[in-house]
């Protein structure tokens, strides 16, 4: 009831203005352990059936917040209090950049979806790392999503990813290389097996922390499988599928620029993930994101082979009790099917 009133006000504002107001509050809350604990007591949820050890990291539950919400790693402590099992900060770039011109964030309310053309706006890796350290350590694993600066030419992309990773080596529990945002010109062209192989070979030399590749939902299946295979062969520990889509047919009134996320992406993301899991389940860690807004969809992705999940748009539309609701219902679904833990359910449809 309370969030419905807050949501009505926020949705009366420009989407990015509303996001900035929420972020300001979350940054303030992050500075108060007392308030964070109060939030956790209200909206957190803990159940040993949902815990899992993955790549040496302890996840209280499989539900994470996707990159893009906390671009500068400045409100992580508050966000952990809303029931997430982990968070992904960023996207951080080596140098600060403003991103694309506003307006660049839009709601498609009927479809419970968002369209963003943000363009990796962030304060840069140095300030991002400083923000991260301010309230560390955190209660859950934190990933750092890394991107390429817009002004960097393709020929120097590898050097740019090396530079941003180097700035972030002493923060975060894992790293995600973002080659799949549609909002940086030609970035998706880097989704090819040669560049991906070079990228992960380079990163493996720099860190022992887990490395992930985030892929687009608009790749042809054969291309996607080839790119993922190249990443795994070069040392990637996991794949995050998927980023936003440029398929404008999924909403009634799309804007010209930007990628779509939310419920409009559910079917497309699920289909891509199904192909990914058929080929690579048990060969790497698979993370499913895109159009997950309830326990049923979350459970389906887990049974399809997802060790971890991420949400974003659903958090905007459903509010602070979303994680708690999904996780409570997920436990019921596990119990109904006789699973003693979420770990047992991972990939059940493939066995």
Swiss-Prot record:
Pathway: Pyrimidine metabolism; UMP biosynthesis via de novo pathway; orotate from (S)-dihydroorotate (quinone route): step 1/1
Domain of life where this protein originates: Bacteria
Membrane topology of the entry: Peripheral membrane protein
Catalytic site positions: 181 (nucleophile)
Subcellular location: Cell membrane
Name recorded for this polypeptide: Dihydroorotate dehydrogenase (quinone)
Gene behind this protein: pyrD
Organism: Helicobacter pylori (strain HPAG1)
Similarity comment text for this entry: Belongs to the dihydroorotate dehydrogenase family. Type 2 subfamily.
GO molecular function: dihydroorotate dehydrogenase (quinone) activity
Protein purpose: Catalyzes the conversion of dihydroorotate to orotate with quinone as electron acceptor.
């Amino acid at each position: 009831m309370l969030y419905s009133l807050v949501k009505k006000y926020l949705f009366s504002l420009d989407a990015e203005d509303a996001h900035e107001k929420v972020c300001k509050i979350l940054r303030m809350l992050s500075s108060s352990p007392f308030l964070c604990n109060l939030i956790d007591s209200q909206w957190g949820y803990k159940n040993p059936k949902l815990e899992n050890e993955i790549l040496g990291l302890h996840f209280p539950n499989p539900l994470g917040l996707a990159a893009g919400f906390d671009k500068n790693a400045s409100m992580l402590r508050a966000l952990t209090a809303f029931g997430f099992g982990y968070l992904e900060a960023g996207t951080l770039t080596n140098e600060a950049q403003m991103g694309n011109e506003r307006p660049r964030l839009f709601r498609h309310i009927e479809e419970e979806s968002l369209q963003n053309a943000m363009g990796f706006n962030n304060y840069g890796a140095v300030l991002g790392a400083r923000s991260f350290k301010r309230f560390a350590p955190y209660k859950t694993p934190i990933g750092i999503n890394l991107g390429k600066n817009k002004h960097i030419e393709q020929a120097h992309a590898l050097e740019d990813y090396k530079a941003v990773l180097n700035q972030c080596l002493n923060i975060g529990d894992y790293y995600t290389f973002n080659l799949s945002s549609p909002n940086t010109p030609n970035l998706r062209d880097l989704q090819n097996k040669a560049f991906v192989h070079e990228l992960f070979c380079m990163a493996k030399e720099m860190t022992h922390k887990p490395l992930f590749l985030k892929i687009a939902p608009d790749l042809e299946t054969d291309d996607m499988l080839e790119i993922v295979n190249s990443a795994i062969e070069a040392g990637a520990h996991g794949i995050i599928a998927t980023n936003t889509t440029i398929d404008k047919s999924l909403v009634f009134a799309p804007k010209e620029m930007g990628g779509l996320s939310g419920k409009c992406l559910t079917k497309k993301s699920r289909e891509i993930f199904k192909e990914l899991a058929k080929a690579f389940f048990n060969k790497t860690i698979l993370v499913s994101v895109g159009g997950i807004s309830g326990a049923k969809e979350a459970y389906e992705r887990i049974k399809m082979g997802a060790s971890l999940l991420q949400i974003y748009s659903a958090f905007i539309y459903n509010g602070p009790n979303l994680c708690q609701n999904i996780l409570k219902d997920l436990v019921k679904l596990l119990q109904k099917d006789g699973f003693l833990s979420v770990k047992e359910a991972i990939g059940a449809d493939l066995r």
